[in-house]
Amino acid sequence: MFLVPSVFGRPYLYSDSATVSVSSRIVAALTVHLQENILYQALSEAVRRFPQLAVSPAVSGSEYCFQPASGNLAIFRADDPDQPECFGDSRLGGYLFKVSYLHKTLFFDFHKSIADEYGMMTFAKSVLYRYLELSGFPLENDGTVKLMSSTYFSAEGDDPMEKLAEIPASRPVWYMDAEALRLTQHSAESERVVTVRIPISKLRSGLEQFSRTPVTYLAPVFSEAVSELEDPSRDQGKYVVASIMVNLRPYFPAASLRPFCTPVYLAYNRRLTEYPYNTVLMSQKKLLEAQLKSDALAYSAERTASLIEKAVDGAGTLEQKKNMVLEMHQQMAAHSTYSICRVGNIILPDSMQRLVTDFYPVIPSGNQAYALSVVTYRGEIIVSVSGKSDTWAVTRRFVELLNSNMIDAYLSDEYIFSPMNYHP
């Protein structure tokens, strides 16, 4: 039952946004200006179609659980200085997401206990489709969008970790257990976001796999940019380590929209300034691909689940569990320098895609130096880089390094973003 938090979603209910990232944002841009009354109707239908997302946090004994959200839905203007900034604000009606808009752009901010980026983008696709349908645009669904006329089925709200119960798990054969370089944490509440675009049609010969596994190609380049700017003298014995959040659905198919990602770690062990790009790439691919085998992913997921269960199960007061979850987050963060999440290919019906010009997630950096999200949409790989320090400088160097290695990339946008707060 979806009122019981999923394994990977549970810790966020105990986590304070002052110490860890508990929310993400989905950004969608249309070719037409948004009308609030139509958007409200589409969203109202969506919360009935996706009841597993229409929940509020509640306390049962010494644990957090969910209860159906009973308040009124609301939509906000993104330029309103008085809009809600915290989950728990009464104007959100108890919901763990906020929908706002400005001109042609729509924003979905959501708490990570209810969904991951893939799950929330599925929800956002349905809202957008219904909005355009209600606006009078002729649309034809090809099966890639869940329609409001379809029926919720229980698998959409199941805990996807149940899929791994019978999967053999084993530690990867090739694994570099490196000490991660940790950078100074900044206390700023806002994030500076820079987006990078890589046209797939301009990828040179020999990079045919880039669009299928872009993180393999992007991680070593971003690690080099971080190393140059943050650790130019190369702290001996420490490495820039990427925490790669892997969407497990392609490996263990699940209909659930609830959190279903696990981290694997990629240490930057050969520098682009010392070896050719292809040599660095082969080394990184070997380390990463070993961790992306089904048994290795199951091992990573089960190890993460074990840490979560140790923190929130068993005896202890609610306050004690909050402290244990904080320690867990700190323990996991110590393994990496930055995080990168490959959400996947964003597929929309052709009749809808021509009306949706942009569609990507923004993941706050939280207790990491930077957080990257990677999606493929409309023939481009879109990388959003978030950070509290000089995101522009590291992203600019990232693009320079991509271009110098014959990967045609360009900086496309920069803005300030304030993630939603949450205080359990």
Give the residues covered by each predicted segment.
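Acyl-thioester-dependent acyl-group transfer interface
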Residues: 1-63, 71-98, 228-424
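Catalytic-site-adjacent helices and loops of nucleotide signaling machinery
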Residues: 211
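Short amphipathic alpha-helical segments
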Residues: 214-223
